[in-house]
Amino acid sequence: MINPISFRPGPVTFWTTLVYLALLIPIVIINETVPPAPAAADDGKIEGVNLTEAWLDLTRITRGYHPYNSRFNEEVRGYLLGRVGEILEGSGVGGKKGNVTVFDDLRSNVTGLMAGSVVPTPGSAQVAAYFEGTNILVYVRGKGDDEGDWWRRSAEGGEMEGVRKNERGLVLVNAHYDSVSTGYGATDDGMGVVTCLQVIKYFAHPDHQPERGIVVMLNNGEEDYLYGARALGQHPLNPYIHTFLNLEGAGAGGRANLFRTTDREVTAAYAGTSDPFGTVIASDAFGLGFIRSGTDYSVLYDVYGQRGLDLAFFKPRSRYHTNRDDATHTSKASLWHMLSAAIHTASKLSGDTGDTFVGARPDGARNKVRNGSPSNGVWFDLFGKGFVNFGLRGMFAWSLTVLVATPLILVLATYILHKLDKYYFFTSSVRTYDQPDFEPVLVGGWKGAFRFPFAFIVSGALSLAVAFLMRKVNPFIIYSHRYSVIAMIFSLFYFTFWSIMRGANFARPSALHRGYVNIWLFILGWATLVAVTVTEDRFKLGAGYPIVFLQTAVCLTTFLTLCELFALPKKTAWGQQVREDHEVHDYYQPQSGNNNTRTESPPPLPQIPHQPSLVPPATRDSNASTLRQGDGNDTDDEDAAVPTERTPLVGGGNATSEHFRTTFATTYRRSITALVNGARKYGQDGDEPFEHEQAWSGRLPSWLWFFQFLILGPFTIILAAQTGLMLVDAVHQTGADGSNLLLPYLIVFAFTVLVLLPITPVIHRISHHIPVFLLVVFVGTLIYNLVAFPFSEESRYKVYFVQQIDLDTADNRVCYNGVDEYVHKIIAELPSASGRNVTCGESKRAELVSCCYDGVDVAPRLGSETPEEDTPIEEIYKSLATVTATRGEGNKAQLEIEADNTKACFLEFKQPISGFNVQGGSEWDDRFGQFPEGGIKQLKLWHRQRGERWVVDVEWKDAEKLEGQVVCAWSDANEAGTIPALDEGLRYSPVWAAITKFAEGLVEGRKGFSV
């Protein structure tokens, strides 16, 4: 019976294929599905939380586009205030009664530098903004919080009314209720908003009062540049917020991903959720800029110093900021995934009554909250059910241990094997005697030594070549066919690696093949771990944890590789046995020719004993010379008798028998029975070498490979596969944003290599069936990926829309920004562009082009009142915005801006201004950056109410006069006909195209000024 785990093609093929399928299939399913929401009958799975109610709220607030600069945004705000009141009334509290206080914040204004404008070039002009907030905050008093309105400041001196006794800090749960002007905001961020409503409902219930106070904030203006979170900085509760949970949506459904956390301690609050999902690799990718997306997390952590988590939907990105970010294209399951995680995490953060989030900051920043000393963490989920969270310092210590200790252990094992004469690696032959006249015995220990690096380089090079080919020929194919790309690169690497390793082993079979691969994996992993350890220490990155686990496993498998050599005989003993077998063979071999012939430099003996030749046939011609033996004075070789069938097998004491000695001229002699038995021991059951491998390899354990594969394979496959899929999902559709088109392919390649590394030591034993099948897969997917159209109705290409109007001349242009090839295809389908001259140039978005045409046929209707039919278009546009510039003393001026039916106007200056003041606004907030030495080149102005006037005092240096433009933005496209160009684009663009906003305004109206 064949050993089911023997190192033979059948068992190796079966077990490796089974393990890969058993792990990869569930990982793909988990990646593509969402844990089911509780049934309607079990809607109260979490006491006090109602999923049906939350879903109904979602459908209400996503009936229209609701950017900050829209009328429906105001309706959404009113609806949310009403829902908060209903929830509190249902919980037995209302307004400021009891343990809950509602803040309808219409007072917080913020003036400061735009974070994205901060550049390292000294003296460069930058961008500033003035914003008026409309946030809604609900404070749920904790059991340990002070009584009364402890947050109020006295009118005199700005000091607290009293010293707050509880220093444990508050927990913030945050979401934004505005959407982009081209998306309904179901996922971004409607689900976060309705989750916040349920969080209020849960903690407002008397039975669920939190230990530490919880602040639920529904902020407004996030989409235009995180303005709502900036306005929080002016609220009296903000200094007491120590931790936060930010709820976001950078996709349109799926699972809510733990995208970022500030430290290990806050991550622990999330760890116990029923369906965790996320990895620290995504967090580090954000920090390094590989994933472009800004959320309120940036303000809460970077500016205010709060510690917290970013829980966000992240796919599919093709629906993000489009009209398919609606309730139809998401699910209750996705909502429940975020809602259940938010309730759990907020409860854990609030329930920490120790000193975890209290105390001095390690950076000593005085303008940030004192919330203790965080520690960097490493975290990831397992199959969407388990969650691992440990300290980065611990991983750093373990990395150092692996780097230092494991080479020493392997060196020690190698030394012991060498002393025992059992180290077969890197040994070509062995000498059994010290005399130079005796030729060495071949061991074959170098066979297979350099196969792995050659196969790895060739397979990797071919896989990378295919990735670059895709980038060159059809770069967006991964946009909608990522699994086709994954299958292509996976199958190519597998087949190429197998072909080289199997071919090399066929040409020169080696029992050390698996061992050499483990040694190479150790060397490669050790070098990689050095780099990972440096990033852990210097840059505080935990993304290298798969390498740490992989190298730990490789160290163990390499150690086992050395340990199995202990089962082998000593090299010299084995060599002597081979020599003896050859002695018997040559002793009985019939000989002819000159018996004095002797080779000057005898070749090494072959390693395989001539067992069938121990008893020679009766008739056989041979060119072997006759042998002689003597004491140096006996040279009578010619008298030596040729043995025949009558010659005794065992020599006697007579003189004649003394002539029958071996070719090795040794005085060592054994009985023929001992020689035969010694030779036969290599042919006993279980000791036979596999096929044509080295004869001594028959004693190697045939089952050890199985346990080595279990050590190296499953955990590495799990980490690499689920992390790779998550990262590919995060970036494979970012090419439309102008991101690097090669990056998704490189991620696929890198994690393909990681997934397949565990099989490399045994891949040469796999039968041809799997590799040939994968070759067919590669050919099919390669052809498909080269010729298929990259977009589909389910994965639409996003193009960026803006309409620009000169309010003085009434000239207007419709512009689409994107990749040149596809922008032209989209514009070609638009009736208003037919026959028009389309001009293209560089876009403000990197790596994209801007293609524009005359929009006279699709002129927007932006005013709050409908003009008379015979009113000239020039007069209509001139009345949309006015700017009055009044010169003051020196280089000072006052600008008065009024705009109809909008809340946003921006001032652009030809020469930077050195100072400004918005009358009725707030002072400059240094937390967002010092006033730049190079001045301000653009000032963005936002009002709470549409149609209000801005009065801005400015001053400048050097120039005699100040020139610039006022750019007002209109973003409300809910009423058909308001922006006909957008309506036309949504109606007539190809089914594979989606339209999203280019900037804050769908329409930008410009008017110049000079003073």
From Swiss-Prot:
Enzyme class: hydrolase
Sequence intervals crossing the membrane: 10-30, 396-416, 450-470, 484-504, 515-535, 547-567, 700-720, 743-763, 770-790
Catalytic residues in the record: E222
Site (Transition state stabilizer): Y320
Amino acids binding Zn(2+) 2: D188, E223, H321
Topology term for the membrane: Multi-pass membrane protein
CDD domains according to UniProt: M28_Fxna_like
Membrane side Cytoplasmic: residue ranges: 1-9, 417-449, 505-514, 568-699, 764-769
Disordered: annotated segments: 587-657
EC number: 3.4.-.-
A single GO BP: proteolysis
Pfam family, one: PFF1_C
Compositionally biased tracts (Polar residues): 589-600
Cofactor note: Binds 2 Zn(2+) ions per subunit.
Entry-linked InterPro entries: Fxna-like_M28_dom, M28_fam, Peptidase_M28, PFF1_C, PFF1_TM
Key words of the record: Glycoprotein, Hydrolase, Membrane, Metal-binding, Metalloprotease, Protease, Transmembrane, Transmembrane helix, Vacuole, Zinc
Cysteine disulfide links: none
GO cellular component entries: vacuolar membrane
Localisation per UniProt entry: Vacuole membrane
Location (main, coarse): membrane
Membrane side Vacuolar: residue ranges: 31-395, 471-483, 536-546, 721-742, 791-1011
Biological role: May be involved in vacuolar sorting and osmoregulation.
Protein name: Vacuolar membrane protease
